[in-house]
Amino acid sequence: MNASAAALNESQVVAVAAEGAAAAATAAGAPDTGEWGPPAASAALGGGGGPNGSLELSSQLPAGPSGLLLSAVNPWDVLLCVSGTVIAGENALVVALIASTPALRTPMFVLVGSLATADLLAGCGLILHFVFQYVVPSETVSLLMVGFLVASFAASVSSLLAITVDRYLSLYNALTYYSRRTLLGVHLLLAATWTVSLGLGLLPVLGWNCLADRTSCSVVRPLTRSHVALLSTSFFVVFGIMLHLYVRICQVVWRHAHQIALQQHCLAPPHLAATRKGVGTLAVVLGTFGASWLPFAIYCVVGSQEDPAIYTYATLLPATYNSMINPIIYAFRNQEIQRALWLLFCGCFQSKVPFRSRSPSEV
């Protein structure tokens, strides 16, 4: 009995000594896995490689004997995946409605369909990135995914700009715009938009990345600082153009309201309320776009790869919300989209509102 007790005490002493040696080794400089990503792994748009450092697409996740990943899932990655799922579901519905309803194939709804398609691809990209990051970690797949996401979000922002231009022209040249605008012209505009977006997405895949030179990495790996600066500058230009056009739209709306007031010798309350509502809607549209993307675009310029990864997550996640809100602003508020929804979910519904092509300012 005494011998077994002594052996037990001796084993406990050895265990304590081993734990002390491990703690000393850690204090002396053993690598730390960090709290914002899986052990020995970091992923762009996914778990950062520690509390400090940019998000990285390359992931080397530890696997167990059976090949299953044993690393903990980053909660930020889960939020991005959930956001992508909601985005994909909403925009898939919009794309299906426009594609299946002949009355919604006008130039205006083609622009809305382009926006919904871009956001749908962005949502699918967020989901696939989560899957590949934790199931099939690979630098090649990571480059493809970041290129896919860059192209999708670039197409989304470009489609928003195209819709803004369409709104402005429809109000500024109201008498001649609809007779000149054709589906072919809209398709050519969107073809140019998607070509530029695809080109931006292909740049990392074609070699403009920081996999070979980690010192050139931005806050989102494997994108280089120069590439991120180009994307941010492009966004600022697009945002500036949209801001200018929306200010001009407000001026046109108020001028029309003033002309009505002169004709009627007073501004009738219904016209005043409609004008204020229209201006308020434009403010919400532009404010939502700016609040979603500006923080991430600014941080991409001023941030560095040594900054905590949580900063990138905290600015990137709201940017994805813009693709979640776009269907509500540009599609589900439209009466024809609402009627198509009723017909989809309740075929017996008979709406008294006839199909007609609403002006882009009403979308």
Curated annotation (Swiss-Prot):
Residue positions with a glycan: N2, N9, N52
Cytoplasmic-side segments: 96-107, 166-186, 251-278, 333-363
GO CC annotation, single: plasma membrane
GO MF annotations, alphabetized: sphingosine-1-phosphate receptor activity
Lipid sites, type S-palmitoyl cysteine: C346
Keywords, comma-separated and alphabetical: Cell membrane, G-protein coupled receptor, Glycoprotein, Lipoprotein, Membrane, Palmitate, Phosphoprotein, Receptor, Transducer, Transmembrane, Transmembrane helix
Entry-annotated residues carrying Phosphoserine: S357, S359, S361
Residue stretches spanning the membrane: 76-95, 108-131, 144-165, 187-206, 232-250, 279-305, 311-332
Location of region: Disordered: 29-48
GO process annotations (BP): positive regulation of cytosolic calcium ion concentration
Knocked-out gene: effects: Deficient mice show reduced striatal cyclic AMP production and selective alterations in instrumental conditioning.
InterPro entries assigned: GPCR_Rhodpsn (IPR000276), GPCR_Rhodpsn_7TM (IPR017452), GPR6 (IPR001151), GPR_3/6/12_orphan (IPR000723)
Extracellular side: 1-75, 132-143, 207-231, 306-310
Tissue: Mainly expressed in the brain. Selectively expressed in striatopallidal neurons in the striatum.
Membrane topology, as annotated: Multi-pass membrane protein
Principal subcellular localization: membrane
Similarity field: Belongs to the G-protein coupled receptor 1 family.
Protein task: Orphan receptor with constitutive G(s) signaling activity that activate cyclic AMP. Promotes neurite outgrowth and blocks myelin inhibition in neurons.
Protein known as: G-protein coupled receptor 6
Species of the source: Mus musculus (Mouse)
